[in-house]
């Protein structure tokens, strides 16, 4: 299963708007994707409640994993999304 690590750029981390954008993008991939904060347990990235429950803050490292056809491309798209400070606009 491919994995990617990325530091979250949004000033407030994965809360409210950034979390919503992230989850919408995950769902649009059609793939099972997980996200974990640091060395924590992975959660289903399709659930906004689980994603927000991780309490990911600015510059926290998360690990994304996906399974299925085009998993690498989906992970790259998600990494690029998390590198953007969505709170700056």
Predicted features and spans:
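Compact, glycine-rich, soluble single-domain proteins
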Residues: 7-57
